[in-house]
Amino acid sequence: MKRQENVLAEREREFQTKMKVIRRTHHKNLVHLLGYCHDGPNRLLVYKYMSNGSLADVLFTLEKQPYWIERMEISRNIARGILYFYEECMPQIIHCDIKPHNILMDESMCAKISKFGLSKLLKPDQTKTFTDIRGARGYVAPEWHHRMPMTVNVDVHSFGIVFVCLFKPLKNKLV
């Protein structure tokens, strides 16, 4: 579960739209949103429980280190989830915060993308958008530092950093 407090009134419509889209997304590599409730400006999002924690827990805990073949499968899972955002979702979703802490692992060690709080929805005729910088230092795409429009490439860049973390696991200095 994730609690969001003090949601501003002007963001209510954006929140409701995002919840409608996320509730309609069904893919084996996305964490399933079971529902949400609200009390005034406070929100409680309920996601399916992921028993193996986050990819960060797996990568940065010596006892949980995956084998190379498992690392390849984890990278495929993440890539499939990102591809779903761009090729199958309507509207398209730019996640904006792909990082090991936002990739959750189910009981079979299948990687699932979670935490859509920073995501942006693209309109059907839209290929890019402008927004304030979002995401974790070390994982954000260079476009944000140059105030360029955001495209699906920002998630591809973040995935590249996660991919490096998968195959060269070091102490987590990026987050």
Language model region names:
Residues 1-175:
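Conserved eukaryotic protein kinase-like
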